Regions:
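Hydrophobic, well-structured mid-protein blocks that either form specific transmembrane helices
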Residues: 89-132
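Acidic, serine/threonine-rich low-complexity disordered tracts
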Residues: 1-97, 137-224
Length: 224
């Protein structure tokens, strides 16, 4: 059969290229900045996330990207890359999904991982895009098979919780709050998407053991 990554993509309504900037907060104090972008990449898209954090003597800089096509309302990722530098060891994670050969390759050396192929796979970044498409289709509960950075399958579960107004560095926006569930009571993950900004991620908040880990808030947005 033909490789969908090579043959084309569907154009999704509301799935539009953008550039966005964020402030990374913890306990109300700014500790860094981040940016996200979506751009056309040949027949598909590239979704990227960059962040730079400084907290006391700790420094962390990350660059993350996912390339994918959209077919019949589903994202099909072909390549995922995450690079981390700063305090401690540098990291490089890479995944390649060959839909024609049904092979998953990992690491810089692109070693074939011996794991049963799954047509539902998403990576750590592309599943964000799938949430956007699913919300646009009216879905309120989402279950995804997500490959972690080592190419191991994980189940991610999210649900729509409510719609509410947020006051952000960007300004005041009305957003849909979605919550992750099923990962244990000690970890909470909330994300807010703004319909008026093409369902852009405008805030991301995480807590573990009742301690806030980060609060990423939109500061600037530009549609492409």
């Amino acid at each position: 059969p033909a490789d969908p990554v090579a043959t084309g993509t569907d154009s999704a309504v509301g799935f539009k290229p953008f550039e966005a900037s964020y402030q990374i907060l913890r306990s109300g104090k700014k500790h860094g900045e981040a940016s996200r972008y979506l751009k056309r990449d040949g027949v598909g898209y590239e979704l990227g996330y960059n962040s730079k954090i400084s907290w006391l003597v700790f420094k962390d800089e990350r660059k993350e990207r996912s390339r994918f096509v959209i077919e019949q309302g589903r994202l099909k990722p072909s390549h995922y890359l995450m690079q981390r530098s700063g305090t401690g060891p540098s990291r490089h994670y890479e995944l390649s999904l060959d839909w024609a050969q049904k092979q998953l390759k990992t690491e810089k050396k692109q070693v074939v991982k011996q794991i049963p192929w799954n047509d539902q796979w998403l990576d750590m970044l592309s599943f964000h895009g799938q949430i956007v498409l699913d919300i646009q289709q009216g879905k309120t509960d989402f279950v995804y098979d997500v490959l972690n950075r080592h190419g191991e399958n994980r189940t991610y579960k999210y649900k729509v919780a409510t719609e509410e107004w947020l006051s952000l560095p960007y300004g005041k926006v009305k957003a849909i709050r979605i919550e992750r569930y099923g990962q244990g009571p000690d970890k909470q993950v909330y994300a807010w998407l703004a319909p008026e900004l093409d369902f852009l991620l405008v805030r991301l908040w995480q807590s573990e053991d009742d301690v806030e880990q980060f609060d990423v808030q939109l500061s600037a947005y530009k549609a492409q």
